[in-house]
Amino acid sequence: MGVPALFRWLSNKYPKIISPVIEEQPYEVNGEQIPVDTTRPNPNGEELDNLYLDMNGIVHPCTHPEGKPPPANEQEMMLEIFNYTDRVVNMVRPRKLLMIAVDGVAPRAKMNQQRARRFRSAQEAKEADEKKEEFRKQFLKKSKGDQEIHEEVIQKTWDSNVITPGTPFMDILAASLRYWIAYKLNTDPAWEKLKIIISDATVPGEGEHKIMEFVRSQRAAPEHDPNTRHVIYGLDADLIMLGLATHEPHFRVLREDVFFQESKARTCHLCGQAGHKAEECRGQAKEKNGQFDEKGKGTSLKPFIWLNVSILREYLAVELYVPHQPFPFDLERALDDWVFMCFFVGNDFLPHLPSLDIRENGIDTLIAIWRDNIPVMGGYLTKDGHVEFKKAQLILQGLAKQEDAIFRRRRQVEEKKLANEKRRKEEAQARDRARKRRRSSPNYEPSEPPASNRARGGGGDSAPPNDVELIIPGRGELSRENRELTHSMVVNRGAVYRANMANKSAAAILKSKLMKGSQEGDDTAESTPMPDADGASDSKIEPTSPSVLGKRKAEEPEGETDTPADNTDSTPKPSKDDEMPPDTVRLWEEGYADRYYEQKFGVDPQDKEFRHKVARAYAEGLAWVLLYYFQGCPSWNWYYPYHYAPFAADFVDIGDMELSFEKGTPFKPFEQLMGVLPASSNHAIPEVFHDLMQDPESEIIDFYPEDFAVDLNGKKFAWQGVILLPFIDEKRLLAAMEKKYPLLSDDERHRNTVGREVLLLSDGHPLYQDLVANFYSKKQGAPKYTLNMRVSEGLAGRVERNETYIPHSSLVSSLEEYGMPTLEDDRSLTVNYEIPKSNHIHKSMLLRGVKFPPPALDNADIQATRSKAQHSGRSFGGAPFRGGHGNRGGRINYASDRPNPFAAHLDPNFMPPSNAGAQGMPSGWAPPVPGSANFSRGPPPPPRGNHRNHYGSGHAQQQGYQQTNYGRNDYYGRGQQGHQHQGSYGNQSGQYSGRQSGYGGAEYRGGGYQRGGYQGQGQGRDYYNSRNQGGYGRY
């Protein structure tokens, strides 16, 4: 899930990170379909090594798709999953490895969110079924028992909650994936050299984090290729941040193009047809293909897009570079800080801070505060997945100063938006009333229905009936009968129109609604993504159906939600969308913090210590999330124990926090099922546990409320609200379940065990013979075989014999009736795979020998990004930047005659670092010759566009550390030109002016960081690319 709307925000702010996927399609020759030859070079221009599939992003849309009927049964669902996966593999064409990761048991911190979503999904499915039954009864009463419709609408909504570890469905999915992979290894030549790792739902951990654990383990191997090309597919927005967290520069995220869905939905507003804009409309009627347009174009395949993490790194390198920061710029550490700041705006484990919203550019606000505080912090916020809270305290204090202004501005925007919506509705209602008055007039002359009505079935056909005589100029007069008929129609046209409107069949309307209700019910599954502001899914399982508070579908016209009666009042009624409950917290008014804690937490508004307690728990959560992204799960049992987040102003003295997490153990699959599923989904849980969920006398019956509150929390729709469910008491749950375990069947016990990853490969892979000789020869080798990375083509780890696999046995299919055959001789190999564990933490650094792709940003992109970085995120205050022609990028001058907002945070004994380089420079000193030992060391200048030496490209140590001395942060930039920056310190306190013969030609002002700034006296030269940045002069 990650940050809602992050994908749209990133693609709008950094447009070059998105590029379309070039996908070859099968073609027909003499009526025979010829598949794509994926052994040929990749049409996207680059060969890719490893493909990782976050499989839940495939399972959910295949089992309950949008825009078409769902599969009839689980067998058809498996076929849909096979076809979708095959399409993704064919477009990426990985040459070395495919990893399929299904969500297993999640950490406790994630289970709270899963519980809320599954309870909401079950409630919506129940409401959809109730609506179907109500419509069915109405229709049968009107239509006198149309059996066809009766059978069509009585089908219950498929419960997507079964896509949870431990259910029979997930057991079927795991077995089906193993069969399909083995089938492809036996039949597809493109898979011959491919290694496939399957981590199914029996292996604990979320799919994307199991993938990240694998990537980190391979990076730690001595023979790992630092230029491995990675692609990860999934619907979660946090895959972007996980890609950055790997510090693998050759990384792409693959996903469906949600913007294509929007462009497809947009039609010409004049004629209602797709394919052209209003200014291109010629008013032509829609051409039907077939008598009823049944041969029209079907649903087209959704295109895919790349999100290029390497280009995102380029953008962030420009945006996060702060001129004259008092320590060397380190892009990898800066990227970690950026990922950490994204957590404040939203993640799967913590509610976002009230003052931060991605749609209000909350990340930009944090970046601006971060840039302003870099000189004060003296270093980065994070290091290798650990937060330095003393520095984080400064960021939160900077945000706290802007909170009041943010809330007031948000209210102003909302009021303006509501006023505009009200005005548009009133104008539309006025037009409708005028139209009705015209139609009620006896002289009303209806015009030809617009093409949009014809396209939607609301008007006439594009061709007249065969028995009506056409009026064609030049062919003479009409017959007498038709002439009299035409005269009568013209004279009585108003009455004819009103009669036709009144004679519409109520049964037909009900039938239409029944069909629509059936489709809506199918879309209530939890993981059909609810489009957020970016058109993308902000979670795997956001619903698309009307919410529990009655969210109206976008395509459902207002005023048509009920079958019209003869005596329907034409007076417009206010829609449900206008009936929002009042926001009693009123964040835009004085005293909002007291009201917030009193209403949301139920505590005394004067209890300040409680606020600090919530803030410390939230800070602990931030530390947990960062470790989870960079090092793996730090604790399986930790969770944030509140439904709401604190304000930034409540983070007091968090710099003194000392955190330690107890690792713990993950839940068993049935324990997670009991922790996240509602009682209405008990069909997915073994029957022995049903009483615990349904019996009023059950010791944990309070965990399964039938009704629960949804706090809109200032939002408009229930899917945006906060689900107020009681948190699970782990000790009570496990104690109650322990009594039932002896009653489980053998099959149920098998589903409740912890599984292992499996590795599959074909007999054409070089590793095949080694493994067969070790495990299946007469002279067997060690039970655990350590892979030789040269033979395995880059795969590190250990493997063991899989007890269920028999070499060259038959590959049995359970889908033979669907065209998936049983193979008599299975030539693939299956072994258990163990991801290698490292004794060292994952370092935020580039690996030795990495080679960067050519820069994607040109000089215009860099200048635009730098300009935005200097001014964005400052809508609500904050330290300003100097503007003007001669002051580009200059910092504000905190001298003796100006207050320094950072002074309150400084140690009274703080002294700026000495500059030994300035003291040893003789008069007339010149910079070293390019290529000499001390040339171009220290922080690099901002990137210079498409220059061939951009960020030191072409040298083995680009953007990286000196490998033998991690932490020193020395950069080797021999590829860069030496841009001299000659600057003499002025006499004014705390600033210097300079002439530049090199980069930028801009004047920089000094950034003194004690209360009165520093005084730079005397002469000195500041050489931008020297090891030390000029001199501070005499303090």
UniProtKB/Swiss-Prot annotation:
- Which intervals of the chain are annotated as region Disordered? 417-470, 515-583, 865-1035
Q: What is its EC number?
A: 3.1.13.-
Question: Where does the record place it?
Answer: Nucleus
Question: What keywords were assigned to this record?
Answer: Coiled coil, Exonuclease, Hydrolase, Metal-binding, mRNA processing, Nuclease, Nucleus, rRNA processing, Transcription, Transcription regulation, Transcription termination, Zinc, Zinc-finger
At the top level of its lineage, which domain of life is listed? Eukaryota
Give coiled-coil spans as residue ranges.
Answer: 406-434
Listed Low complexity bias regions: 972-996
- GO function term, MF aspect, one: RNA binding
A single GO cellular-component term from the record reads: nucleus
UniProt cross-references to InterPro entries, sorted A to Z: 5_3_exoribonuclease, Xrn1_helical, Xrn1_N, Xrn2/3/4, Znf_CCHC
Q: Where are the zinc fingers (CCHC-type)?
A: 266-283
Please classify the protein's predominant subcellular localization into one broad category.
Answer: nucleus
Compositional bias annotation for Polar residues: 564-573, 955-967
Can you cite a GO biological process for this protein?
Answer: positive regulation of chromosome segregation
Q: Which Pfam families match?
A: XRN_M, XRN_N
Q: Where is the composition biased (Basic and acidic residues)?
A: 417-432
- Disulfide connectivity? none
Stretches with biased composition (Gly residues): 880-889, 997-1019
Chain's role: Possesses 5'->3' exoribonuclease activity. Required for the processing of nuclear mRNA and rRNA precursors. May promote the termination of transcription by RNA polymerase II. Essential for vegetative cell growth and chromosome segregation.
What family does the database annotate?
Belongs to the 5'-3' exonuclease family. XRN2/RAT1 subfamily.
Please give the subunit comment from the record. Answer: Interacts with RAI1; the interaction is direct, stabilizes RAT1 protein structure and may stimulate its exoribonuclease activity. The interaction also stimulates RAI1 pyrophosphohydrolase activity, probably by recruiting it to mRNA substrates.
Q: What is this protein called?
A: 5'-3' exoribonuclease 2
